[in-house]
């Protein structure tokens, strides 16, 4: 591929990077020169980091952060984190080098499969429903499952992304929001499709994506076939008003309508607006369950499996408390 030892490039060491799968530590030896890849995966990380670091500098995506570090002297775990950050801040422009596109696709596909396998390859249709796990009666008990774990490992017709109005991902390296994680696992193809959608809005004289709707895209390297994006309400200071409740309910209705109308068999839900958008989880959970129940009552023939994905045990407990009440 004509790749040579990279020059010393600015390393954004002050930028927090997302967590990545653990890599056996490689202790750098200042007298040994460049670190040599030991596996095909490390070789792929090496060439991709070089390519996207050079791409970022050439296009002005990154500022100079001292001190300059030669990329091939970084341990591979650090290079992978750096690559994650470079992809996070990268605008949705084409990847011109076909070899690099193929290498990136191969890396992301392998990592996504490994993440799913480590999580037990969860399948939305195979998860026990609330009737079994929590004794919930009616349509809610028969159609809905509650799962604790990483939404991006779920095999489903679609998973839900809590997007912002620009629809291009979080763009902040290391930020742990679901928007960032979904784009990181899915890969640049997702941002490119979202950019195309937003370009269409701009051509029609429309602005940011409104709150309370749903947009369907491909899933790319996610186990899920699609992503349903929704922009939730922003709650300042944790004070929930009627308009916030109305808009959050609209998000979930739009998600379920989109899944049903598209003919999906299942959808994995994240907790919309409860992160950086400030909606208290304890107030959101009962509203989510109520909205799902009302939607199921209005669609008695639906066979849609709905999986509520709780990120942590604490989040799961919030939903279980709402179910108990």
Regions found by a protein language model. Name each.
Residues 2-325:
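Macrodomain-like recognition of ADP-ribose-binding/processing modules
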């Amino acid at each position: 591929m004509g790749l040579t030892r990279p020059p010393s490039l600015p390393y954004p060491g002050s930028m927090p990077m997302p967590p990545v799968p653990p890599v056996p530590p490689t202790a750098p030896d200042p007298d040994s020169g460049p670190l040599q890849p030991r596996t095909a995966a490390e070789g792929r990380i090496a060439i991709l980091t070089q390519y996207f670091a050079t791409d970022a500098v050439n296009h002005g995506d990154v500022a100079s952060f001292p001190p300059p570090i030669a990329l091939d002297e970084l341990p591979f775990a650090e290079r992978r984190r750096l690559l994650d950050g470079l992809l996070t801040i990268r605008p949705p422009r084409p990847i011109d080098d076909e070899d690099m596109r193929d290498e990136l696709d191969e890396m992301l596909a392998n990592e996504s499969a490994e993440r799913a396998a480590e999580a037990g390859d969860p399948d939305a249709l195979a998860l026990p429903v609330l009737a079994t796990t929590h004794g919930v009666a009616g349509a809610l008990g028969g159609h809905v499952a509650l799962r604790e774990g990483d939404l991006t490992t779920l095999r489903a017709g679609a998973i839900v992304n809590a997007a912002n109005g620009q629809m291009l991902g979080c763009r902040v390296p290391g930020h742990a929001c679901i928007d960032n994680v979904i784009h990181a696992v899915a890969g640049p193809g997702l941002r490119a499709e979202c950019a195309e959608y937003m370009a269409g809005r701009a051509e029609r004289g429309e602005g940011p994506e409104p709150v309370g709707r749903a947009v369907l895209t491909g899933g790319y390297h996610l186990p899920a076939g699609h992503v349903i994006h929704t922009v939730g309400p922003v709650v300042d200071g944790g004070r929930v008003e009627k308009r916030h409740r109305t808009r959050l309910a609209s998000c979930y209705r739009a998600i379920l309508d989109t899944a049903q109308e598209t003919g999906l068999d299942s959808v994995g839900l994240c907790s919309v607006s409860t992160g950086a958008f400030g909606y208290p989880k304890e107030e959101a959970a009962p509203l989510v369950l109520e909205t799902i129940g009302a939607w199921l009552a209005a669609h008695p023939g639906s066979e849609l499996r709905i999986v509520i994905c709780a990120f942590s045990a604490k989040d799961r407990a919030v939903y279980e408390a709402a179910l108990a009440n």
